[in-house]
């Protein structure tokens, strides 16, 4: 497939109903995909996510629309600003990267991540972080091409592992 050069990218306005509908639709599609856990978003998440996102200034999202497909929303990246105590600067965690199946492999994620990097730099962030599943080799290739590396402090101590505990 050829790369799409005519995407319309924007930072999501959480108060904009069109942006929020696109965000919810894309996020629900991602949640239903095996890479997102294969379960739809809960009714609670769908009902409360717009207000929850708008209430948190340390969150931001990017949308991609394809004008050639009637302005269809085709990509989403959700980001969370954190803080690096070692650098004493903000960092940005790329939390969700979503591209609809019809547009995968066409440069959508790359274009969105370029905008994410610009927005992170404008926030004074020292780095971007993200998690990726071991089986998602296309995403890993993209992230490496964009300069991401596995996290480690001392190679003798190995690479960091992403862990979770549900509360």
Please give the residue ranges for each predicted region.
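Conserved N-terminal entry element of GNAT/NAT acetyltransferase domains
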Residues: 1-21, 25, 32
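C-terminal "cap" of GNAT-fold acetyltransferases
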Residues: 3-9, 124-167
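A short helix-loop-beta-strand connector motif used in the catalytic cores of GNAT acetyltransferases and
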Residues: 51-63, 93
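Conserved beta-hairpin
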Residues: 59-77
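A conserved beta-strand-loop-helix scaffold within acyl/acetyltransferase catalytic domains
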Residues: 66, 79-86
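Conserved acetyl-CoA binding element of GNAT-fold acetyltransferases
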Residues: 89-101
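Conserved acetyl-CoA-binding loop-helix of GNAT-fold acetyltransferases
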Residues: 99, 105-118, 141-145
């Amino acid at each position: 497939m050829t790369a799409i050069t005519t995407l319309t990218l924007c930072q999501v306005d959480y108060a904009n109903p069109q942006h929020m509908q696109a965000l919810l639709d894309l996020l629900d599609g991602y949640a239903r995909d095996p890479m997102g856990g294969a379960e739809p978003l809960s009714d609670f998440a769908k009902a409360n996510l717009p207000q929850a996102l708008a209430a948190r200034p340390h969150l931001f999202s990017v949308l991609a629309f394809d004008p050639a497909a009637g302005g269809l929303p085709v990509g989403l990246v959700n980001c969370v600003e954190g803080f690096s105590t070692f650098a004493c600067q903000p960092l940005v965690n790329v939390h969700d990267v979503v591209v609809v199946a019809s547009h995968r492999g066409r440069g959508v994620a790359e274009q969105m991540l370029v905008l994410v990097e610009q927005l992170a730099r404008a926030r004074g962030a020292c780095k971007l972080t993200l998690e990726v599943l071991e089986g998602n080799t296309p995403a890993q290739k993209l992230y490496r091409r964009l300069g991401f590396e596995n996290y480690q402090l001392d190679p003798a101590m190995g690479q960091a592992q992403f862990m979770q505990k549900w509360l």
